[in-house]
Amino acid sequence: MKTSCCREKAVMNFASGNNAAHRGNSYVVAVDIGTSTIRACLYDSKCELRNFSQDKVKLYYSGASEEVLRCEINPDELFEQFVRLVNDVLVYVDKDVDEVTMGICAQRNTFITWNRMTLEPCHRMISWKDCRAKEVCKEWNESLTLKALNVSGAVLHFFTRMPRFKAARMYKFINQMITHRLLVTLDENPFMKKLVDKGLLAFGCIDTWLISKLTNGRIFVSEPSSASSTGVYDPFQQQWGDVILKIVHFPAKVLPDLTTTAGEVIAIADKSIFGAPIKVGAMLGDQQAALFGCGCRKKGDVKISLGTGSFLNVVTGENPHASMSGIYPLVAWKTPENICFVAEGNSSDTSTVLEWAQSLGLFQSVEETSSIAESAPVDTPLFFIPAFGGIQTPVNDDNACCAFIGLRPDTTKAMMVRTILESIAFRIYQIWTKFKEEMDLGAVPTIRCCGGVSKNNFLCQTISSLLHLPVERVEEESFSAAKGAALLAGLSAGMWKMDEIDDLVKTGKLFTPNAVAHKLLKKKFIKWESALQRCLNFYE
């Protein structure tokens, strides 16, 4: 299968039809907008990948230091890529097709504001990696206002035992939330303030922006899986969080309406864009899409994504999980019939550290790192802390530094590569340990694994041995998010039923834990945690 490079615009007559299951000549176009890559994938009526087209997402960086680092995306460039890539795969659709449905999944917490009347952007998209609000978040976290919120949460939880108040006890603002990045941007932009006063400013993450563009501004919506990661959505109330909005003086009137993730038509793309109207049957956050694409949809199912960052997700069913250690209670997806929640822990630096190591010349290609790591001694006395973006769950230290600890004159490149891969596994184990402390997980039969970095056999085997659980890698591991968006969009179109999803998800290699390796890795993990302590609060 190759990346399509056709640029011809497809002109088709997509019949609306009725939602009869298993239409043999129906397709789903799933678009996955990640941090570094945007890809459009064409799936057939059996949810098999028929073709795809992809491109790099261009990030614009500015700022002289980490504290003021700005990371942005040109919205016009992104929308042009979106349309072009979708058209690339549409040329492979039969002219007499019954229906084409679209599913969209996107990186979370990258946002933009625009004039609701003209769709004119007020600024570039502000990436989740952007640090412009880092100092503001720190000031707020030290403020009496937030301390009062934490104390109030503790008191109310003591008397009510409600999970919502338990979460409030530990609530902290982090830069990845959209709240303060938007407020900083609003303070810098007089045009935005005028639009707010006139009631014309629209705010949205990538999903909301795309739907507005596809419908020429007619539809202004978001959905809970994307909204729940922003920091201004209350998963316990299943609505925008009035308390937080009022505390930080966030202009609530700029927020989009909330709709479902899938199960019904969310919007219909204007026919002028793709040559015919296309129904959008699903939209959601990328990690939730990957969760569904891995076949993890029942309570207790576990998924690990290894991509730009590492994400560990546990499906919690009908109830959100209230955590004291930075495990996030998120909406997995919402349909007209029900809502499903997921608990998430993350580590920001996975492929990031591998790309950095490659740039230093530690290896020629990421594909060879598995064999290189295998060639290094098992008891290498070297430790790596993957903290270019700080240390997230469960440590939650934005000021941690990245470091090799234990370098010696006889340290080799192979040792360094092995240590880097082990550090990714150690972060997963750290998160997993906290999950086990806070949640009754019961017997977990298998963990599903996906993401580009999961192609690394050494890393998957290390995770399996360390967690002492089987790890099952899905087929087409780099496409799991697109697959999830396609599966949900196909449900909306009636192409398959929920009880058929398991048969549509294909799994690949199964990694089983090694008892000897488990003992050695546990010992090394203890030393690694000691090394980590030396890197915490480094930039304070």
Question: What are the functions of these language-model segments?
Answer:
Residues 65-68, 72, 76, 88:
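Conserved non-catalytic scaffold segment of RNase H-like nuclease domains
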Residues 67, 84-366, 529:
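Glycine-rich phosphate-binding/catalytic subdomain of phosphoryl-transfer
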Residues 29-31, 69, 304:
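Broad, structure-driven detector of short, well-ordered beta-strand segments within folded domains
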